[in-house]
Amino acid sequence: MTNFWNRRRLRHRYVFDMVPTISVNASQGAGFPAAAEEISEHTKVSPHVYSGAMAVIFDPLRGRVRPDASHSDAEIVDVLTETYSDADWAVLTGAGMSTDSGVPDYRGPDSPPRNPMTIQTFHSHPDQRARYWARSWMGWPRMRGTRPNRAHLALAELPVAGIITQNVDGLHQSAAEAVAAERGNDSGAPAPSPVIDLHGSLDRVICLQNGHLFDRDLVQRRLSELNPDFAEEVGIDPIDVETAPDGDVELEDTAGFIVPDCPECGGLLKPDVVYFGDSVPAARVQQANRIADEAAGIVVLGSSLAVLSGLRFVRTAAKEGKPVVIVTDGPTRGDELADYRSISRVADFVTTWARR
């Protein structure tokens, strides 16, 4: 055993929600952070076949058209800061928050095809599991080097009620650290807003047998030890690659890639992100619900609300008569519920908000 396996785990275990699983069909692909609970009436999944390893996703936004802006950004910001205060708002963020950091989204013009892996496949198909880990190992150095953009930094300056993110890149936390460092010992500065990684985070790895968490860098090191010549064999420099939204890299041949087991129980290791058919930890759901329930309204930044994990917060707010603000330059599934709709770039809007 190397020193990697002697490192202390991050936390003891998770308690998981019970969420119905799904059967799916496809051939190849990478992990996608979406749980079975997010499959809506508009998301179709093909029947299970023995060789099928991935989910085929039909975009629930197909046919939707981006609405016009309901108000100017200045008018919306007046509502956020004068009719209410910053602390009244829960903020839900999606992939559009991170595109300016170089993290691609799922629906942009240059987005890769979406053939996401399911948790069932990860459990039962060793070849697909190794394929996933090879792609993830290759993409992690680039993803790890991603830095928060001005949207993250501006939002980190705002004392909002809390941030619920569907992203798995950890950039909200990085932005909070950068803002705190810039403020130094300013005793009058507001405390950082809580951040809930609804779909998990790529910087952690979880054992599917005992729930223990490990630091991703340590797992990355172990993967490198087990596969010292892999990058050279496939002819790709891990530092100079284009990653998919989940931080992995397209690879044609992953045969022979070796994946370590959990050092404590021999179980399967998986990045701590939620796959199709997987379930969101109950404690995480409760934390997100608490933020949304206690807020006076919700601001959606850079999310198409294509999956129910995000859309349900908007639906609940609208049902309770709370104001809904949506900011993104494309259509969303919540547009008809929005009281205030901006079609500006997320970074431009949040910067305007932070300056008021």
Regions found by a protein language model. Name each.
Residues M1-F16:
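Extreme N-terminal basic, low-complexity initiation segments
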Residues R7, A34-A35:
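Extended intrinsically disordered, low-complexity segments enriched in serine/proline/acidic residues
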Residues Y14, S23, S27, A35-R356:
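Conserved catalytic core of sirtuin-type NAD+-dependent deacylases
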